[in-house]
Amino acid sequence: SAYTYSYTALGESIAWVVGWSLVLEYSLVVSTVAVGWSGYFVGFLQWLGVGLPQALIAGPHAGGIVNLPAVAITFLVAGLLMAGTKESATLNAVLVVLKIIALGVFVAIALPAFNSANLQPFMPYGFSKAMGPDGIERGVMAAAAIIFFAFYGFDAISTAAEETKNPGRDLSIGIVGSMIGCTLIYVLVALAAVGAMSFTVFGKSPEPLALILRELGHGKAALVIGAVAIIALPTVLLAFLYGQSRIFFVMSRDGLLPRGLSKVNARTGTPVAITLFTAVLVAALAG
């Protein structure tokens, strides 16, 4: 990982800064995705006729008390990681395939409804980043900064080096291959979404892809997309919680954190204490 490289090449002080920067980065990613998952989960429950109190589906900053679904999914994924790397990796692979199929279905339905008028004006807020009267930054550069958020996961792959049979080959294929594949998927999904509906409409929804399909008259497909998001979106949490806990683990082993946190469970072969600590930290941010 970037931490290990910094520790080896630049020294302990730089590695300490890089390590905590990665921890902050991963914490923000996991908490954000957990809140996004909560939006799909709550929407799915509402479709089933089940409503949750506003106080339990939003944090204090959004007028609630705690985002209970976001906190629950964080601890659920952490529990899976504590059960063992092999088990979590197998489930992750299955869910990723399911997620790719769902995105393929979305593109197949939304792309035929493509309306070029939705792309006009092509850059409605201009190229440079600018602050709007509502306090929200807009523009191509502001959007680019947000899109980089989607590429954080490629660094997380390198945190699995010690648990990989052939890291020299496998990590290279994993990082480059997934970056190419994900970029193509991102472009296709974004093109299909913006072409099918104005971004000003679905951009405000907590479940944008499902909303687009419903508006196109594909209610059942929207339900499937929502269900798949609920089932498969935790793969992002899985990857980043794994990466974050392993960074904590290595920092602990290197003496930059209490060494007791680097203890590995004899039965599962996983750092249970540091994984639980990571989950508590992320759940506090998400909730």
Residue ranges with predicted function:
Residues 49-68, 97-227:
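Helix-loop-helix junctions that connect adjacent transmembrane segments
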Residues 1-8, 90-96, 159-173, 211-214, ...:
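Short amphipathic alpha-helical coupling elements at transmembrane boundaries
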Residues 17, 21, 72-98, 162-163, ...:
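Membrane-water interface regions at transmembrane-helix termini and the short interhelical loops
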Residues 12, 63-71, 165-186, 203, ...:
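Loop-to-transmembrane helix boundary motifs in multi-pass membrane proteins
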Residues 78-79, 107, 190-191, 230, ...:
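Alpha-helical transmembrane segments of multipass membrane proteins
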Residues 21-36, 146, 151-165, 186, ...:
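Membrane-helix boundary/coupling elements in multi-pass transport proteins
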Residues 11-24, 69-73, 132-147, 214-238, ...:
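Select transmembrane alpha-helical segments in multipass membrane proteins
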Residues 1-74, 79, 230-250:
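Hydrophobic transmembrane alpha-helices that form the core helical bundles
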